[in-house]
Regions:
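Specific aromatic-rich, kink-prone transmembrane helix
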Residues: 111-114, 136, 152-169
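Perimembrane helix-loop-helix junctions
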Residues: 188-204
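Transmembrane signal-anchor helices characteristic of membrane glycosylation enzymes that use polyprenol
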Residues: 9-44, 52-54, 98, 102-105, ...
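Short acidic/glycine- and proline-prone juxtamembrane loop motifs at membrane-interface regions
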Residues: 144-150
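Start-transfer (signal-anchor) and selected internal transmembrane alpha helices
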Residues: 1-27, 111, 117-118, 126-128
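Transmembrane-helix motifs of polytopic, lipid-linked glycan transferases
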Residues: 95-120
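Short helix- or helix-capping micro-motifs
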Residues: 21, 129-137, 176, 180
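Extracytosolic helix-loop segments that constitute the early lumenal/periplasmic catalytic or substrate-binding loops
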Residues: 38-65, 69, 77-87
């Protein structure tokens, strides 16, 4: 079979995996309640930002322990809920909260597939790794069941280190800033970036 035909078939298979991965996460999101503490925070933060605007969000005495990078997404979700009269803790509201992290998970799956394909070609190992990333129980639990937003900061963080490997230092640093603006846990990767970035620049 010509290599171009194989590549087209594999690209179609990748799209099927991506769509299925997002669909599974959204079905889980609709069917489960999520982690109640974080769910209530996400809903309240979105409502506050949507109604009061960014200038009044970090107000004295108001609990908000997330940086501002992801808050506009929560505000957009709040706006959609108000527009269509959707309850935040209902199935549709939960799907809206899980939508962006699920799409970011799909972006991570595509990135893993592209890296694996460069290293291993159009092989069974490449698709096994892609499938594992798509349906890893940890990712499904985090995004689909708990409704966490980790996918939204893991994607730019993974892209950051991929760009570092390819010696594209400025875009890598910018993407690390994006990840850090979404969730402070990106600081855990800071030491690695602090070593890799200066070493790469010096080697260049």
């Amino acid at each position: 079979m010509p290599s171009r035909t194989i590549q087209k078939q594999n690209n179609r298979a990748l799209w099927v995996i991506l769509i299925a991965a997002v669909a599974v996460r959204l079905v889980l999101a609709a069917a489960t309640a999520g982690y109640p503490y974080d769910m209530s925070c996400f809903i309240a933060w979105g409502d506050k930002l949507f109604t009061e605007g960014p200038a009044n969000f970090y107000s004295e005495g108001y609990f908000a322990d997330y940086p501002p990078g992801y808050l506009p997404v929560l505000a957009a979700v709040a706006g959609l809920r108000k527009l269509f009269g959707v309850a935040g803790d209902g199935p549709v509201g939960r799907v809206l909260l899980a939508l962006v992290p699920s799409v970011c998970d799909a972006g991570l799956i595509a990135l893993v597939h592209c890296i694996a394909r460069r290293r291993m070609g159009e092989s069974r190992q490449t698709f096994c790794l892609t499938l594992f990333t798509a349906f890893c129980p940890l990712f499904l639990f985090d995004t689909g069941l708990w409704k966490q937003i980790d996918g939204a900061f893991v994607l730019p963080l993974a892209l950051c280190f991929w760009l570092l490997e390819n010696r594209r230092y400025l875009p890598a640093a910018l993407l690390y800033g994006v990840a850090l603006s979404i969730k402070p846990q990106a600081l855990l990767a800071g030491p690695g970036l602090a070593v890799c970035l200066p070493a790469g620049v010096a080697a260049a």
